[in-house]
Amino acid sequence: MPPSSPRWLDIVRHRIRGFRGPYLLILQHHNIPAASRIVAPVTLPLRGDVDVLAPRLTIHDVEYRVRILDMSAVPLAMLADRVASAADSADAIMSGLDIILHGYPVGMPL
């Protein structure tokens, strides 16, 4: 798949200089046309990581964490090749997004 067409939950390399994580997770669905994609950094685990806000991923037999709280929009030109898919972790990723966007516990009244 060409780097210009990343799909939802693809894990890709990037071309962002000075960025701390080796990979980005595509959070924006591929059917939404845009010149950028909403992504979350994928980094090595840090002490104190909370599973719901930093779900675990395994890429090439190495454990990483998705930094959902650090999601941002990145131009398509900054996205490089696909290295894996996080489809098997979709439930954990969506739970983290739900908590960030809707509060904890999910569905808690405002």
Regions found by a protein language model. Give the residues of each.
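Intrinsically disordered, low-complexity and often Lys/Arg-enriched segments
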Residues: 1-7, 106-110
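Compact nucleic-acid interaction/catalytic patches
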Residues: 2-3, 11-57
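C-terminal terminal-subdomain/extension
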Residues: 59-110
